Design a protein with these regions (language model features):
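Cytosolic Rossmann-like ligand/nucleotide-binding regulatory domains
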Residues: 14-82, 87
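Long, charged amphipathic helices and adjacent flexible linkers at domain junctions
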Residues: 1-15, 86-87
């Protein structure tokens, strides 16, 4: 996870890896309810840059660049968090 402050601290650019048990893994862009204030800029997968569309699916190990308003960082952290599985 890397992040960079932009716009005099009003926003951040965050690069994060999609883990196998992340809430985003194997999800289609159109099925993700991104909060207002968070946008996906690009995905780095298998040595290629992908500009996501509504049909893009997040894969394990994708490196994703997010743009977020500072006030939305907590919501983004929740999206990137690990899903708990109970048996």
């Amino acid at each position: 996870l890397s992040d960079y402050s932009i716009g005099e601290g009003f926003g951040e650019v965050i690069e994060a890896e999609i883990l196998s048990n992340s809430a985003l893994c194997n999800k289609n862009m159109k099925d993700i309810d991104l909060p207002k204030g968070i946008r996906i800029g690009s995905i780095f997968r298998n040595g290629k840059i992908i500009i996501p569309t509504s049909s893009t699916v997040f894969n394990e190990n994708d490196d994703v660049v997010f743009f977020s308003e500072s006030k939305c960082i907590k919501k983004l952290e929740e999206l990137l968090s690990i899903k708990q599985s109970y048996e």
